[in-house]
Amino acid sequence: MQREEKQLEACLDALISQVSDIKNSLVGFIHKLENEYDRLTWPSVLDSFALLSGQLNTLNKVLKNEKTPLLRNQVIIPLLLSPDRDEEIMRLTEGRVPVFSHEVVPDHLRTKPDPDVEELEKQLSAEAARITSEAAQKQVQSMNKMCSNLLDKISKEERESELGSLRQNKQTFNPTDTNALVAAVAFGKGLSNRRPPGQGGPMAPGQTGASSMLPNATGMQVPMSLPPNQQQQHMAGVSMSQGSQPGKMPSSIKTNIKSASMHPYQR
């Protein structure tokens, strides 16, 4: 018997502590709503709700614990009723109950709801009993359909929001390539100083002049049969052009290209 009494006392102490924490959280939240509503933010409200939810879950765990005795089996009986002011009750109830008389006992030790609430519950129970099973099934199906449509809309909005955030955060360029291009254009980083052959400048040993640019120029030579006077004039023009530029190598590519262009279809 003493063991059960100790367990009951420990359970009551734990419940009083949990309820006191919940009460303090509620008082602080109500104070914010009444006095700090102008600068109250939504994250702060969510934090307050999360704190209250966690404390209520802890209280439920204490009540459902195996070591917690069944409080419903315990009976509370007032041993003394007095119309006089009781300071101890004032301290325990924080000034809310000054006396413990016949007027307040039915309210504070009530095991049933208030009469108004009890009457409303009876009306709702009577209305639920009058509904047929078919009508109730239709109402349930209608409610399920509405909930499904609402869930679909919420899921669609969530997907669209995620896709929009992905489009905004998607990177459309490579930072490495961009930095390399900027460095090449601004500072010439990574560019080669060599010139391609045939673009001017001194030629390396072993390289020829224009013949290196046109490797198939020799294949463009086409035998021509010209009259003797035109052939002499043609050869004289070539010799004059070669003689007018002393110190340069004679170029036959110009003549060959010219002759090829005059008869493109001759084989």
UniProtKB/Swiss-Prot annotation:
Coiled-coil regions, chain positions: 1-26, 116-160
Q: Where is this region: Disordered?
A: 190-267
Superkingdom is: Eukaryota
- Listed GO MF terms: transcription coregulator activity
Q: In which pathway does it act?
A: Protein modification; protein ubiquitination
Where in the cell is the protein located? Nucleus
Here the segments flagged for biased composition (Polar residues) are 227-245
Recorded GO cellular component terms are: mediator complex
- What's in the keyword line of the UniProt record? Activator, Coiled coil, Nucleus, Transcription, Transcription regulation, Ubl conjugation pathway
Gene Ontology annotations of biological process type: protein ubiquitination; regulation of transcription by RNA polymerase II
Pfam families xrefs: Med8
Assign the protein's first listed, main location to one coarse class.
nucleus
Query: What's this chain's function?
Result: Component of the Mediator complex, a coactivator involved in the regulated transcription of nearly all RNA polymerase II-dependent genes. Mediator functions as a bridge to convey information from gene-specific regulatory proteins to the basal RNA polymerase II transcription machinery. Mediator is recruited to promoters by direct interactions with regulatory proteins and serves as a scaffold for the assembly of a functional preinitiation complex with RNA polymerase II and the general transcription factors.
The similarity comment for this entry is: Belongs to the Mediator complex subunit 8 family.
Q: How does it assemble?
A: Component of the Mediator complex. May be part of a multisubunit E3 ubiquitin-protein ligase complex.
Q: What is this protein called?
A: Mediator of RNA polymerase II transcription subunit 8
Organism field: Xenopus tropicalis (Western clawed frog)
Designated gene of the protein: med8
